[in-house]
UniProtKB/Swiss-Prot annotation:
NCBIfam families attached to this UniProt entry: S16
Superkingdom, natural source: Bacteria
A biological process from GO: translation
PROSITE patterns named in the record: RIBOSOMAL_S16
The keyword Ribonucleoprotein belongs to this UniProt entry's keyword annotation: yes
Keywords: Ribonucleoprotein, Ribosomal protein
GO cellular component labels: cytoplasm; small ribosomal subunit
Protein name: Small ribosomal subunit protein bS16
Pfam families registered for this protein in UniProt: Ribosomal_S16
Cysteine disulfide partners in this protein: none
PANTHER family registered for this protein in UniProt: 30S RIBOSOMAL PROTEIN S16 (PTHR12919), SMALL RIBOSOMAL SUBUNIT PROTEIN BS16M (PTHR12919:SF20)
Length: 81
């Protein structure tokens, strides 16, 4: 099972926010997830990013691959260098 750390879109039309989740790479974007490790709200100024650092490091050490966007967010928070 290939596990990815990716964004799950939530919120209303034209008012999105995203949950940072761990999911099977074959599941749909807003489908079943394994774990939720944070959220990202791009509409606030500055953007609101909250990540559970311990959970993120645990999943990364277990082999979960972050998407390109999530990798940028994790760098901003300081989870990865």
């Amino acid at each position: 099972m290939a596990v990815r750390i990716r964004l799950k879109r939530m919120g209303a039309k034209n008012n999105p926010f995203y949950r940072i989740v761990v999911a099977d790479s074959r599941s749909p974007r807003d489908g079943k997830t394994i774990d939720e490790i944070g959220y990202y709200n791009p509409l606030k100024n500055p953007a609101d990013i909250k990540v559970d650092v311990e959970k993120a490091k645990k999943w990364l050490s277990n082999g979960a691959q972050p998407t390109d966007t999530v990798k940028i967010l994790l760098k901003k928070v300081g989870v990865i260098e």
